[in-house]
Amino acid sequence: MKRTIIAILALTFICAGLGLAQAKHPSELTYPALKYEPPDPKAFRVVYAGGLRAFVQEDRSLPLFNITALVNCGDLYVPKDKAGLGRILGDQLIKGGTATRDGSAIEERIDFLGGSLNFMVGERTSSLSLSVLEKDLDEGLAMFFDVLRNPAFREEPLKLAKARFVEQLRQANDQPGTVLSREYERILYGDNAVTWQATKATFEGVTAADLQAFHAKYFSPRNVILAVSGDFAKAAIKAKIDKLAAGWKSGAASFPALPKAFPTPEPGVYFIQKAINQGYVSLGHLGLEDTNPDYFAVQVMNFILGGGSFTSRITTKVRSDEGLSYNQGSRFTYRWGLPGTFSGYVQTKSSTVGYAISLIRAEFDRIRKEPVSDAEMETAINYYLESFADGFQSAQATMMSFANLEMTGKPMDYYRTFRSRIQAVTKARVQEVAQKYIHPDKAVIMIVGDFEPCNKGGDKWPGPLDKLGRIHKINLIDPMTGLEMKTP
Protein backbone atom coordinates (compact mmCIF):
# COMPACT_ATOMS: atom_id res chain seq x y z
CA MET A 1 0.00 0.00 0.00
CA LYS A 2 2.81 2.37 0.95
CA ARG A 3 4.58 1.72 -2.39
CA THR A 4 1.31 2.39 -4.26
CA ILE A 5 0.80 5.75 -2.55
CA ILE A 6 4.38 6.78 -3.30
CA ALA A 7 3.95 5.81 -6.96
CA ILE A 8 0.73 7.82 -7.25
CA LEU A 9 2.36 10.88 -5.70
CA ALA A 10 5.34 10.58 -8.02
CA LEU A 11 3.07 10.33 -11.05
CA THR A 12 1.13 13.38 -9.86
CA PHE A 13 4.29 15.49 -9.61
CA ILE A 14 5.47 14.31 -13.02
CA CYS A 15 2.14 15.29 -14.62
CA ALA A 16 2.18 18.63 -12.84
CA GLY A 17 5.69 19.25 -14.09
CA LEU A 18 4.66 18.45 -17.65
CA GLY A 19 1.73 20.84 -17.34
CA LEU A 20 3.97 23.63 -16.08
CA ALA A 21 6.46 22.96 -18.84
CA GLN A 22 3.69 23.33 -21.43
CA ALA A 23 2.14 26.48 -19.92
CA LYS A 24 2.52 29.59 -22.03
CA HIS A 25 3.43 33.06 -20.94
CA PRO A 26 0.28 35.23 -20.68
CA SER A 27 1.49 37.31 -23.62
CA GLU A 28 1.46 34.16 -25.76
CA LEU A 29 -2.08 33.12 -24.92
CA THR A 30 -4.60 33.36 -27.72
CA TYR A 31 -8.37 33.34 -27.63
CA PRO A 32 -10.90 32.46 -30.28
CA ALA A 33 -12.56 35.43 -31.95
CA LEU A 34 -15.79 36.52 -30.33
CA LYS A 35 -18.58 35.52 -32.65
CA TYR A 36 -21.98 37.10 -32.16
CA GLU A 37 -24.66 37.57 -34.75
CA PRO A 38 -27.62 39.74 -33.78
CA PRO A 39 -30.98 38.13 -34.45
CA ASP A 40 -33.22 39.29 -37.27
CA PRO A 41 -35.73 41.88 -35.95
CA LYS A 42 -38.35 40.62 -38.39
CA ALA A 43 -38.47 37.29 -36.53
CA PHE A 44 -39.72 39.07 -33.39
CA ARG A 45 -42.06 41.66 -34.90
CA VAL A 46 -45.80 41.25 -34.33
CA VAL A 47 -48.82 43.53 -34.69
CA TYR A 48 -51.51 43.53 -32.03
CA ALA A 49 -55.03 44.95 -31.95
CA GLY A 50 -55.45 48.43 -33.42
CA GLY A 51 -52.14 48.30 -35.27
CA LEU A 52 -50.08 48.23 -32.06
CA ARG A 53 -46.60 47.11 -33.15
CA ALA A 54 -44.31 45.06 -30.93
CA PHE A 55 -41.06 43.13 -30.78
CA VAL A 56 -41.54 40.06 -28.61
CA GLN A 57 -39.13 37.40 -27.34
CA GLU A 58 -39.81 34.45 -25.08
CA ASP A 59 -37.12 34.23 -22.40
CA ARG A 60 -37.41 31.34 -19.95
CA SER A 61 -34.12 32.00 -18.15
CA LEU A 62 -35.88 33.72 -15.22
CA PRO A 63 -39.53 33.85 -14.07
CA LEU A 64 -39.87 37.50 -15.11
CA PHE A 65 -42.02 39.61 -17.41
CA ASN A 66 -40.82 42.86 -18.98
CA ILE A 67 -42.63 45.29 -21.23
CA THR A 68 -41.82 48.79 -22.46
CA ALA A 69 -44.06 51.06 -24.50
CA LEU A 70 -42.02 53.41 -26.68
CA VAL A 71 -44.13 56.43 -27.60
CA ASN A 72 -43.33 58.94 -30.34
CA CYS A 73 -43.69 62.06 -28.21
CA GLY A 74 -41.47 64.26 -26.11
CA ASP A 75 -40.24 67.70 -25.18
CA LEU A 76 -39.68 68.81 -28.79
CA TYR A 77 -43.43 68.53 -29.38
CA VAL A 78 -44.30 70.94 -26.55
CA PRO A 79 -45.07 74.59 -27.46
CA LYS A 80 -42.87 77.29 -25.96
CA ASP A 81 -45.58 78.70 -23.71
CA LYS A 82 -46.00 75.24 -22.16
CA ALA A 83 -42.28 74.47 -21.73
CA GLY A 84 -41.96 71.99 -18.88
CA LEU A 85 -45.10 70.05 -19.83
CA GLY A 86 -42.95 67.05 -20.74
CA ARG A 87 -41.30 67.06 -17.33
CA ILE A 88 -44.67 67.24 -15.59
CA LEU A 89 -46.02 64.47 -17.81
CA GLY A 90 -43.04 62.31 -16.89
CA ASP A 91 -43.85 62.78 -13.23
CA GLN A 92 -47.63 62.55 -13.39
CA LEU A 93 -48.52 59.78 -15.85
CA ILE A 94 -48.24 57.28 -12.97
CA LYS A 95 -48.54 59.51 -9.89
CA GLY A 96 -51.65 61.20 -11.27
CA GLY A 97 -53.52 57.89 -11.25
CA THR A 98 -56.06 56.56 -13.71
CA ALA A 99 -59.82 56.68 -13.99
CA THR A 100 -60.11 53.72 -11.61
CA ARG A 101 -56.83 53.73 -9.65
CA ASP A 102 -55.19 56.29 -7.39
CA GLY A 103 -51.56 56.99 -8.26
CA SER A 104 -50.24 56.15 -4.82
CA ALA A 105 -52.23 52.90 -4.87
CA ILE A 106 -50.58 51.93 -8.17
CA GLU A 107 -47.10 52.62 -6.80
CA GLU A 108 -47.78 50.78 -3.55
CA ARG A 109 -49.15 47.75 -5.35
CA ILE A 110 -46.18 47.57 -7.71
CA ASP A 111 -43.84 47.80 -4.71
CA PHE A 112 -45.78 45.04 -2.94
CA LEU A 113 -45.35 42.81 -6.00
CA GLY A 114 -41.60 43.49 -5.98
CA GLY A 115 -41.84 44.99 -9.45
CA SER A 116 -41.14 48.35 -11.06
CA LEU A 117 -43.19 50.75 -13.17
CA ASN A 118 -41.44 53.80 -14.59
CA PHE A 119 -42.16 56.52 -17.13
CA MET A 120 -39.62 58.79 -18.81
CA VAL A 121 -40.00 61.61 -21.32
CA GLY A 122 -37.22 62.39 -23.80
CA GLU A 123 -36.89 64.80 -26.71
CA ARG A 124 -38.96 62.79 -29.20
CA THR A 125 -39.54 59.44 -27.51
CA SER A 126 -41.07 58.59 -24.16
CA SER A 127 -41.17 55.18 -22.48
CA LEU A 128 -43.36 53.41 -19.95
CA SER A 129 -41.67 50.29 -18.55
CA LEU A 130 -42.97 47.47 -16.34
CA SER A 131 -41.06 44.58 -14.77
CA VAL A 132 -42.81 41.99 -12.58
CA LEU A 133 -42.53 38.34 -11.68
CA GLU A 134 -44.17 36.01 -14.18
CA LYS A 135 -46.77 34.97 -11.59
CA ASP A 136 -47.93 38.61 -11.42
CA LEU A 137 -48.01 39.10 -15.19
CA ASP A 138 -51.78 39.52 -15.51
CA GLU A 139 -52.10 42.06 -12.71
CA GLY A 140 -49.01 44.00 -13.76
CA LEU A 141 -49.98 44.08 -17.42
CA ALA A 142 -53.47 45.33 -16.56
CA MET A 143 -52.01 48.22 -14.53
CA PHE A 144 -49.51 48.96 -17.30
CA PHE A 145 -52.20 49.35 -19.95
CA ASP A 146 -54.45 51.28 -17.57
CA VAL A 147 -51.68 53.85 -17.02
CA LEU A 148 -50.79 53.89 -20.72
CA ARG A 149 -54.35 54.42 -21.91
CA ASN A 150 -56.29 56.09 -19.10
CA PRO A 151 -54.21 58.56 -17.07
CA ALA A 152 -56.33 60.87 -14.92
CA PHE A 153 -53.81 63.64 -14.06
CA ARG A 154 -55.61 64.34 -10.80
CA GLU A 155 -55.43 67.87 -9.48
CA GLU A 156 -53.83 67.33 -6.07
CA PRO A 157 -50.71 65.42 -7.20
CA LEU A 158 -50.44 67.76 -10.21
CA LYS A 159 -50.49 70.81 -7.93
CA LEU A 160 -47.75 69.32 -5.74
CA ALA A 161 -45.63 68.40 -8.76
CA LYS A 162 -45.79 71.91 -10.23
CA ALA A 163 -44.83 73.47 -6.90
CA ARG A 164 -41.88 71.07 -6.59
CA PHE A 165 -40.62 71.82 -10.10
CA VAL A 166 -40.92 75.56 -9.58
CA GLU A 167 -38.89 75.26 -6.38
CA GLN A 168 -36.23 73.24 -8.22
CA LEU A 169 -35.80 76.10 -10.68
CA ARG A 170 -33.98 77.98 -7.92
CA GLN A 171 -31.06 75.54 -8.29
CA ALA A 172 -30.99 75.60 -12.11
CA ASN A 173 -27.83 77.74 -12.24
CA ASP A 174 -25.99 76.12 -9.32
CA GLN A 175 -24.05 73.41 -11.16
CA PRO A 176 -21.45 74.76 -13.63
CA GLY A 177 -21.60 71.60 -15.75
CA THR A 178 -25.36 71.98 -16.18
CA VAL A 179 -25.01 75.65 -17.04
CA LEU A 180 -22.28 74.85 -19.58
CA SER A 181 -24.25 72.23 -21.53
CA ARG A 182 -27.45 74.31 -21.51
CA GLU A 183 -25.87 77.58 -22.64
CA TYR A 184 -23.56 75.87 -25.15
CA GLU A 185 -26.61 74.41 -26.89
CA ARG A 186 -28.41 77.76 -26.69
CA ILE A 187 -25.57 79.38 -28.65
CA LEU A 188 -25.45 76.60 -31.25
CA TYR A 189 -29.17 75.90 -31.76
CA GLY A 190 -30.70 79.32 -31.13
CA ASP A 191 -34.27 79.92 -29.99
CA ASN A 192 -36.28 76.79 -30.76
CA ALA A 193 -37.73 73.70 -29.11
CA VAL A 194 -34.27 72.21 -28.52
CA THR A 195 -33.34 75.02 -26.13
CA TRP A 196 -36.64 76.22 -24.67
CA GLN A 197 -36.52 76.14 -20.88
CA ALA A 198 -39.37 75.96 -18.40
CA THR A 199 -40.01 78.94 -16.13
CA LYS A 200 -42.22 79.52 -13.12
CA ALA A 201 -44.96 80.82 -15.42
CA THR A 202 -44.84 77.93 -17.89
CA PHE A 203 -44.80 75.29 -15.15
CA GLU A 204 -47.72 76.91 -13.39
CA GLY A 205 -49.57 77.31 -16.69
CA VAL A 206 -49.69 73.57 -17.40
CA THR A 207 -53.16 72.21 -16.58
CA ALA A 208 -54.64 68.74 -16.34
CA ALA A 209 -56.49 69.55 -19.56
CA ASP A 210 -53.15 70.29 -21.29
CA LEU A 211 -51.78 66.94 -20.16
CA GLN A 212 -54.93 65.11 -21.28
CA ALA A 213 -54.79 66.79 -24.69
CA PHE A 214 -51.10 65.96 -25.14
CA HIS A 215 -51.75 62.36 -24.11
CA ALA A 216 -54.75 62.03 -26.42
CA LYS A 217 -52.74 63.41 -29.33
CA TYR A 218 -49.74 61.11 -29.09
CA PHE A 219 -50.69 58.02 -27.07
CA SER A 220 -52.41 55.86 -29.65
CA PRO A 221 -51.68 52.34 -30.96
CA ARG A 222 -50.09 53.44 -34.23
CA ASN A 223 -47.78 55.83 -32.37
CA VAL A 224 -46.56 53.25 -29.85
CA ILE A 225 -44.13 50.35 -30.23
CA LEU A 226 -43.84 47.67 -27.54
CA ALA A 227 -40.74 45.74 -26.48
CA VAL A 228 -41.78 42.57 -24.65
CA SER A 229 -39.77 39.72 -23.14
CA GLY A 230 -40.09 37.14 -20.41
CA ASP A 231 -41.34 33.79 -19.25
CA PHE A 232 -44.44 33.37 -21.42
CA ALA A 233 -45.71 31.83 -24.63
CA LYS A 234 -46.03 34.26 -27.56
CA ALA A 235 -49.56 33.15 -28.36
CA ALA A 236 -50.66 33.64 -24.76
CA ILE A 237 -49.18 37.12 -24.47
CA LYS A 238 -50.76 38.11 -27.78
CA ALA A 239 -54.20 37.16 -26.49
CA LYS A 240 -53.66 39.20 -23.31
CA ILE A 241 -52.38 42.31 -25.08
CA ASP A 242 -55.04 42.14 -27.80
CA LYS A 243 -57.68 42.13 -25.07
CA LEU A 244 -56.12 45.06 -23.17
CA ALA A 245 -55.62 47.08 -26.38
CA ALA A 246 -59.12 46.44 -27.72
CA GLY A 247 -61.07 49.63 -28.36
CA TRP A 248 -57.99 51.85 -28.14
CA LYS A 249 -58.56 54.49 -30.79
CA SER A 250 -55.71 55.06 -33.20
CA GLY A 251 -55.86 58.53 -34.66
CA ALA A 252 -53.22 60.04 -36.93
CA ALA A 253 -50.92 62.08 -34.72
CA SER A 254 -49.69 65.36 -36.19
CA PHE A 255 -46.17 66.36 -35.28
CA PRO A 256 -44.78 69.89 -35.11
CA ALA A 257 -42.11 70.75 -37.64
CA LEU A 258 -38.60 70.28 -36.33
CA PRO A 259 -36.21 73.22 -36.59
CA LYS A 260 -34.12 73.12 -39.74
CA ALA A 261 -32.35 76.48 -39.72
CA PHE A 262 -29.82 77.27 -37.00
CA PRO A 263 -27.73 80.34 -36.23
CA THR A 264 -24.12 80.75 -37.27
CA PRO A 265 -22.53 82.07 -34.09
CA GLU A 266 -19.38 84.13 -34.33
CA PRO A 267 -16.34 82.02 -33.43
CA GLY A 268 -14.67 83.10 -30.22
CA VAL A 269 -14.88 82.86 -26.45
CA TYR A 270 -18.29 82.92 -24.77
CA PHE A 271 -17.70 83.42 -21.06
CA ILE A 272 -20.17 82.92 -18.20
CA GLN A 273 -19.01 84.34 -14.90
CA LYS A 274 -19.18 82.05 -11.89
CA ALA A 275 -16.98 82.44 -8.80
CA ILE A 276 -15.42 78.97 -8.83
CA ASN A 277 -11.79 77.81 -8.87
CA GLN A 278 -12.05 75.80 -12.09
CA GLY A 279 -13.10 76.42 -15.64
CA TYR A 280 -15.68 74.22 -17.38
CA VAL A 281 -15.14 74.30 -21.14
CA SER A 282 -16.85 73.10 -24.32
CA LEU A 283 -15.56 74.09 -27.74
CA GLY A 284 -17.11 73.14 -31.03
CA HIS A 285 -20.12 73.56 -33.29
CA LEU A 286 -23.08 71.64 -34.69
CA GLY A 287 -22.36 68.13 -35.91
CA LEU A 288 -24.39 65.57 -37.86
CA GLU A 289 -27.30 63.15 -37.58
CA ASP A 290 -26.66 59.48 -36.89
CA THR A 291 -28.42 58.63 -40.17
CA ASN A 292 -25.60 60.37 -42.04
CA PRO A 293 -23.62 57.82 -44.12
CA ASP A 294 -20.42 59.21 -42.59
CA TYR A 295 -21.58 58.23 -39.08
CA PHE A 296 -19.38 55.12 -38.82
CA ALA A 297 -16.21 56.86 -39.97
CA VAL A 298 -16.94 59.75 -37.60
CA GLN A 299 -17.30 57.34 -34.68
CA VAL A 300 -13.90 55.80 -35.38
CA MET A 301 -12.32 59.22 -35.89
CA ASN A 302 -13.73 60.60 -32.64
CA PHE A 303 -12.62 57.55 -30.66
CA ILE A 304 -9.05 58.34 -31.71
CA LEU A 305 -9.44 62.08 -31.12
CA GLY A 306 -11.08 62.17 -27.70
CA GLY A 307 -13.81 59.58 -27.28
CA GLY A 308 -11.57 56.63 -26.45
CA SER A 309 -10.80 57.48 -22.83
CA PHE A 310 -7.14 56.81 -21.97
CA THR A 311 -6.29 55.72 -25.52
CA SER A 312 -7.46 58.98 -27.09
CA ARG A 313 -5.21 61.82 -28.17
CA ILE A 314 -6.88 64.52 -26.09
CA THR A 315 -6.73 62.48 -22.88
CA THR A 316 -3.12 61.51 -23.55
CA LYS A 317 -2.09 65.12 -24.12
CA VAL A 318 -4.23 67.01 -21.61
CA ARG A 319 -4.30 64.50 -18.77
CA SER A 320 -1.40 62.05 -19.07
CA ASP A 321 1.26 64.38 -20.50
CA GLU A 322 0.30 67.72 -18.94
CA GLY A 323 -1.68 66.68 -15.84
CA LEU A 324 -4.28 69.41 -16.36
CA SER A 325 -7.54 67.54 -15.90
CA TYR A 326 -9.39 64.39 -14.90
CA ASN A 327 -12.28 65.13 -17.25
CA GLN A 328 -11.48 65.83 -20.89
CA GLY A 329 -12.17 64.47 -24.35
CA SER A 330 -14.34 64.99 -27.40
CA ARG A 331 -17.82 63.87 -28.33
CA PHE A 332 -20.36 63.87 -31.10
CA THR A 333 -23.92 63.89 -29.78
CA TYR A 334 -26.84 62.71 -31.90
CA ARG A 335 -30.50 63.67 -32.10
CA TRP A 336 -33.28 61.95 -33.98
CA GLY A 337 -34.03 64.12 -37.01
CA LEU A 338 -31.69 66.94 -36.01
CA PRO A 339 -27.95 67.55 -36.17
CA GLY A 340 -26.18 66.84 -32.91
CA THR A 341 -23.18 68.73 -31.59
CA PHE A 342 -19.45 68.27 -31.81
CA SER A 343 -17.37 69.39 -28.87
CA GLY A 344 -14.04 69.07 -27.19
CA TYR A 345 -14.39 69.47 -23.46
CA VAL A 346 -12.25 69.90 -20.37
CA GLN A 347 -12.56 70.80 -16.71
CA THR A 348 -9.37 72.33 -15.33
CA LYS A 349 -8.13 74.89 -12.80
CA SER A 350 -8.63 78.52 -13.74
CA SER A 351 -4.99 79.29 -14.52
CA THR A 352 -4.74 76.46 -17.08
CA VAL A 353 -8.04 76.99 -18.92
CA GLY A 354 -6.43 78.78 -21.86
CA TYR A 355 -3.59 76.25 -22.06
CA ALA A 356 -5.97 73.26 -22.04
CA ILE A 357 -8.07 74.85 -24.78
CA SER A 358 -4.97 75.46 -26.90
CA LEU A 359 -3.97 71.79 -26.55
CA ILE A 360 -7.41 70.57 -27.59
CA ARG A 361 -7.46 72.90 -30.59
CA ALA A 362 -4.05 71.59 -31.60
CA GLU A 363 -5.46 68.05 -31.57
CA PHE A 364 -8.39 69.22 -33.72
CA ASP A 365 -5.85 70.51 -36.26
CA ARG A 366 -3.63 67.43 -36.07
CA ILE A 367 -6.35 64.90 -36.83
CA ARG A 368 -7.41 67.01 -39.81
CA LYS A 369 -3.90 67.37 -41.22
CA GLU A 370 -2.09 64.12 -40.37
CA PRO A 371 -3.10 60.50 -41.04
CA VAL A 372 -3.78 58.50 -37.89
CA SER A 373 -1.56 55.52 -37.12
CA ASP A 374 -2.23 51.85 -37.80
CA ALA A 375 -2.23 51.19 -34.05
CA GLU A 376 -4.84 53.90 -33.42
CA MET A 377 -7.05 52.47 -36.15
CA GLU A 378 -6.76 48.95 -34.77
CA THR A 379 -7.63 50.05 -31.23
CA ALA A 380 -10.63 52.11 -32.35
CA ILE A 381 -12.10 49.51 -34.69
CA ASN A 382 -11.56 46.68 -32.20
CA TYR A 383 -13.35 48.70 -29.53
CA TYR A 384 -16.52 48.90 -31.61
CA LEU A 385 -16.31 45.29 -32.75
CA GLU A 386 -15.68 43.90 -29.27
CA SER A 387 -18.30 46.04 -27.50
CA PHE A 388 -20.97 45.46 -30.14
CA ALA A 389 -22.60 42.53 -28.32
CA ASP A 390 -23.00 44.60 -25.13
CA GLY A 391 -26.20 46.10 -26.53
CA PHE A 392 -27.81 42.66 -26.68
CA GLN A 393 -27.03 41.34 -23.21
CA SER A 394 -30.66 40.61 -22.36
CA ALA A 395 -33.78 39.73 -24.27
CA GLN A 396 -35.42 43.00 -23.21
CA ALA A 397 -32.42 45.09 -24.29
CA THR A 398 -32.53 43.36 -27.68
CA MET A 399 -36.25 44.00 -28.13
CA MET A 400 -35.76 47.65 -27.13
CA SER A 401 -32.99 48.00 -29.72
CA PHE A 402 -35.34 46.70 -32.40
CA ALA A 403 -38.19 48.95 -31.23
CA ASN A 404 -35.89 51.96 -31.44
CA LEU A 405 -34.88 51.01 -34.97
CA GLU A 406 -38.49 50.99 -36.10
CA MET A 407 -39.38 54.14 -34.19
CA THR A 408 -36.55 56.15 -35.75
CA GLY A 409 -36.99 54.66 -39.23
CA LYS A 410 -33.61 52.97 -39.48
CA PRO A 411 -33.29 49.86 -41.66
CA MET A 412 -33.92 46.52 -39.99
CA ASP A 413 -30.49 45.27 -41.08
CA TYR A 414 -28.78 48.13 -39.20
CA TYR A 415 -27.21 45.87 -36.58
CA ARG A 416 -26.36 43.12 -39.04
CA THR A 417 -24.30 45.55 -41.10
CA PHE A 418 -22.90 47.63 -38.22
CA ARG A 419 -19.60 45.80 -37.83
CA SER A 420 -18.86 45.55 -41.53
CA ARG A 421 -19.38 49.31 -41.84
CA ILE A 422 -16.99 49.93 -38.95
CA GLN A 423 -14.43 47.55 -40.46
CA ALA A 424 -14.68 49.36 -43.78
CA VAL A 425 -13.38 52.62 -42.26
CA THR A 426 -9.87 53.43 -43.46
CA LYS A 427 -7.22 55.92 -42.35
CA ALA A 428 -8.04 58.01 -45.39
CA ARG A 429 -11.73 58.08 -44.42
CA VAL A 430 -10.84 59.14 -40.87
CA GLN A 431 -8.89 62.12 -42.18
CA GLU A 432 -11.63 62.89 -44.70
CA VAL A 433 -14.42 63.07 -42.09
CA ALA A 434 -12.19 65.00 -39.68
CA GLN A 435 -11.76 67.66 -42.35
CA LYS A 436 -15.47 67.56 -43.15
CA TYR A 437 -16.94 67.70 -39.63
CA ILE A 438 -14.33 69.43 -37.45
CA HIS A 439 -13.91 73.16 -38.11
CA PRO A 440 -11.62 74.82 -35.54
CA ASP A 441 -12.02 78.17 -37.30
CA LYS A 442 -15.79 78.06 -36.69
CA ALA A 443 -15.70 76.79 -33.11
CA VAL A 444 -17.52 78.41 -30.25
CA ILE A 445 -15.52 78.24 -27.00
CA MET A 446 -17.89 78.26 -24.04
CA ILE A 447 -16.33 78.74 -20.59
CA VAL A 448 -18.04 78.76 -17.21
CA GLY A 449 -15.65 80.02 -14.54
CA ASP A 450 -14.10 82.99 -12.77
CA PHE A 451 -13.04 85.42 -15.48
CA GLU A 452 -10.03 87.15 -13.91
CA PRO A 453 -7.90 84.06 -13.11
CA CYS A 454 -9.00 82.34 -16.31
CA ASN A 455 -8.06 85.40 -18.35
CA LYS A 456 -4.71 85.77 -16.59
CA GLY A 457 -3.61 82.25 -17.47
CA GLY A 458 -0.41 80.61 -16.25
CA ASP A 459 3.25 80.04 -17.04
CA LYS A 460 2.73 77.79 -20.08
CA TRP A 461 -0.08 79.87 -21.51
CA PRO A 462 -0.22 83.43 -20.17
CA GLY A 463 -3.44 85.22 -21.03
CA PRO A 464 -5.44 87.02 -22.11
CA LEU A 465 -8.20 84.77 -23.39
CA ASP A 466 -8.80 86.93 -26.44
CA LYS A 467 -5.80 85.19 -28.00
CA LEU A 468 -8.36 82.42 -28.60
CA GLY A 469 -10.90 84.76 -30.20
CA ARG A 470 -13.14 87.69 -29.41
CA ILE A 471 -14.61 87.48 -25.91
CA HIS A 472 -18.39 87.57 -25.49
CA LYS A 473 -19.60 87.99 -21.90
CA ILE A 474 -22.79 85.95 -21.50
CA ASN A 475 -25.30 86.73 -18.78
CA LEU A 476 -27.16 83.86 -17.19
CA ILE A 477 -30.90 83.50 -17.61
CA ASP A 478 -33.06 83.83 -14.52
CA PRO A 479 -34.69 80.38 -14.42
CA MET A 480 -37.78 81.75 -12.70
CA THR A 481 -38.57 84.35 -15.34
CA GLY A 482 -36.55 83.31 -18.40
CA LEU A 483 -35.11 86.84 -18.51
CA GLU A 484 -31.43 87.72 -18.68
CA MET A 485 -29.75 88.48 -15.38
CA LYS A 486 -27.24 91.32 -15.30
CA THR A 487 -23.79 90.39 -14.01
CA PRO A 488 -22.93 92.50 -10.93
Model-derived features: positions:
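Bacterial N-terminal signal peptides
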Residues: 7-17
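Scaffold signal of the M16-like zinc-metallopeptidase fold and its non-catalytic homologs
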Residues: 22-28, 97, 140, 172-221, ...
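Mature N-terminal segment immediately following signal peptide/propeptide cleavage
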Residues: 32-68
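M16/MPP (pitrilysin/insulinase) zinc-metallopeptidase core fold and M16-derived inactive scaffolds
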Residues: 68-130, 174, 193-197, 308-326, ...
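M16/insulysin-pitrilysin zinc metalloprotease superfamily fold
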Residues: 95-100, 130-162, 308-309, 329, ...
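Short acidic/His-enriched helical or mixed secondary-structure segments at domain edges of catalytic enzymes
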Residues: 164-183, 260-279, 316-325, 370-423, ...
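C-terminal soluble interaction/assembly domains
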Residues: 368, 406, 410-442, 446-479
